Every structure is written in structure tokens, then in C-alpha cells.
A protein has these predicted regions:
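The conserved Walker
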Residues: 9
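Hydrophobic positions on the alpha1 helix immediately C-terminal to the Walker A/P-loop
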Residues: 16
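Conserved glycine(s) of the Walker
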Residues: 12
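Hydrophobic anchor at the beta1->P-loop junction of P-loop NTPases
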Residues: 5
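Intrinsically disordered, low-complexity terminal tails and inter-domain linkers enriched
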Residues: 42-57, 119-208, 237-239
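Phosphate-binding/switch loop-helix module in NTP-utilizing enzymes
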Residues: 93-129, 201-210, 215, 221
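N-terminal phosphate/diphosphate-binding loop that engages ATP/GTP or pyrophosphate donors
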Residues: 21-97
Length: 291
């Protein structure tokens, strides 16, 4: 089953998803993919808040977005608020985000690191990663069944080699890394997800839950960004990933359904509430995830 987690911005979807992942792990279900917690800091006293704050009261402001790779828990600084990225020498906005005119400045190197993670997950599920070549039978069939999206730069998503990303990026962090803004935000919010062996070191347990936080305009409108996450979802349910949760903003919900439902069947649209939590947990249990 494909769950599409959606709702208004900054209502706690990722925090809800982190807690859900922790509950799934506690119940014996392997969780693999990525969650994208924000980097939050308290607003200076007297500074007006935006439409939403971390607690709904506007007391916190969002500086950036991290990606936490599951199941191992590795943390990567993924995006920064555009005004802050422009002032920072340590963060370089990638060409993909710039070409798509995204609201956040996203590093191409960070995209490559997350894609390398999803490539490993794809191979464990016997799915060809997006960059494995068009002659692969699995990829070819997925391409036939998947509606085309509008590409960037005549179909070219600027590539960054995964090996280069791993060696050169200053963005890589772990949960016990240096006290940067991302690490401070992580400590303040708490890390509810238990660390596990790296996906490329240990085979994932069967009947795992795939988590993709999130699919945005880069992926659903341009087929760029997290292309290896798209490749796994485009393949539909597999013995390794019979179920998946993808975070999708409301404005892209129709596009996500159009792309994925031919393989998954009718998607289940959920919000960050108790009813959805119980449904996902029961679905995972029925799939044999609890041991």
C-alpha cells in the first residue's frame, strides 16, 4: 500500500513521521528511506512569527532542512533558507534547485548523497536505480508505465558522483557530530529514531516500510532531485517494500497519484493524526513486519 502523507506546511508532518517510524521499529518493522526534519531555533523576543511555528505559535523559525538516512540514522544538511544560503560560504546552492526556482537552496552534493542511499535500497529490493541504464528490463517497464514529467535543462539533472559527494561534502553529519546549527536543532528536538547498521553493510529485513520525506516539485514536476527514491516508488510494491510512505505537499498530490497509482493501486492519503498512525502500524503488522 502507498500512503501519501500530506497537509499544510509546518503542521508537524515530519515530527509525526519520525514518531511513527520509531513506533514501527519498536514493533519489529524495518524502516528505510529518509526523513527531513527542519533546523529550528527560537525566534528573538519581539520578532513576529510566520504563518506557522514549530509549535503552531510562531515561537520558532526554520533555518534549514536536514535529511536523516534510515535505517542507519546518518544526518545530512540538505537545504538552507535561501537568504541564509546566500550569506554562507560553506553552503553552495545546487543547479537543480536553482533551475527549478525552489523556495529552499538545496545542495546538489546532498542530493547525490541521498540518491546514493536510495540506490543501495533499490538494489536490495532488486530494483534498478535511476542511473543504472535504460537497457535494464525493470527500468524500461517502469518508464513505460510512468507518465513523463517536465525535465530541467532539456532532460538533464546535473549529476554529482556519489563517490565525490561522500569525500568532498562539508554537509555530512552524524547524530554525534559537531555542534553546528543542524546538530543543535537535532539535540533540541531529540532523535527518536534508533540508529541501525548502514544499509550497505547489512541486508534489510523483509517487509520493510519505505519512507520518502519528501517528494517536491523537483521530483514530481521535473523528474530530478531524489531520482532513486522515484525509481523505487515507480516499481510499485515489492517483497522488500510492500508498503511505502511518501510526504507530498497538497498542491502536488494529484501529480503523485497520477505517477504512482498505475503500479500501487489507489493511494491512501493520510494526515499526521492518530487514525493514520494506527492504520500504518496495522498495515505493517499484517504484512509480516512484526516478529
Amino acid at each position: 500500500m502507498l500512503f501519501l502523507l500530506t497537509g499544510d506546511v509546518q503542521i508537524g508532518k515530519t515530527r509525526w513521521l519520525e514518531n511513527l517510524c520509531a513506533s514501527l521499529q519498536a514493533a519489529g518493522t524495518c524502516v528505510a528511506g529518509v526523513v527531513a526534519p527542519g533546523q529550528w531555533v527560537p525566534r528573538p523576543e519581539g520578532q513576529p512569527g510566520g504563518k506557522h511555528g514549530f509549535d503552531g505559535a510562531g515561537r520558532f523559525e526554520k533555518l534549514g532542512i536536514d535529511n536523516v538516512l534510515l535505517p542507519q540514522g546518518k544526518r545530512i544538511e540538505f537545504a538552507r533558507r535561501r537568504d541564509l544560503a546566500a550569506k554562507s560560504k560553506a553552503f553552495t546552492e545546487g543547479t537543480q534547485a536553482k533551475a527549478a526556482k525552489l523556495g529552499w537552496a538545496i545542495s546538489d552534493t546532498a542530493i547525490a548523497q541521498v540518491n546514493a542511499h536510495f540506490a543501495t535500497l533499490a538494489k536490495q529490493a532488486s530494483i534498478a536505480p535511476a542511473d543504472s541504464g535504460a537497457d535494464d528490463s525493470t527500468t524500461t517497464q517502469a518508464e513505460v508505465d510512468t507518465p513523463a514529467a517536465a525535465p530541467l535543462d532539456n532532460g538533464v539533472c546535473p549529476p554529482v558522483a556519489a563517490e565525490t559527494a561522500a569525500k568532498t561534502s562539508p554537509l555530512v553529519q552524524t547524530n554525534t557530530g559537531e555542534s553546528t546549527a543542524a546538530a543543535t536543532a537535532a539535540k533540541a528536538g531529540g532523535n527518536v529514531l534508533a540508529a541501525a547498521p548502514a544499509a550497505n553493510e547489512t541486508r534489510l529485513a523483509p517487509h520493510a516500510m519505505l519512507v520518502v520525506d519528501e517528494l517536491g516539485r523537483l521530483e514530481l514536476l521535473h523528474s530530478c532531485g531524489l531520482t532513486n527514491a522515484l525509481a523505487i516508488l515507480d516499481a510499485g510494491p515489492t517483497p522488500q517494500f510492500p508498503h511505502a510512505i511518501a510526504v507530498v505537499r497538497e498542491t502536488l498530490l494529484d501529480e503523485a497519484r497520477r505517477r504512482f497509482e498505475p503500479r500501487w493501486g489507489k493511494a491512501t492519503v493520510i494526515g499526521p493524526d492518530d487514525a493514520a498512525r494506527n492504520l500504518v502500524l496495522e498495515t505493517a503488522r499484517a504484512a509480516g513486519g512484526a516478529h
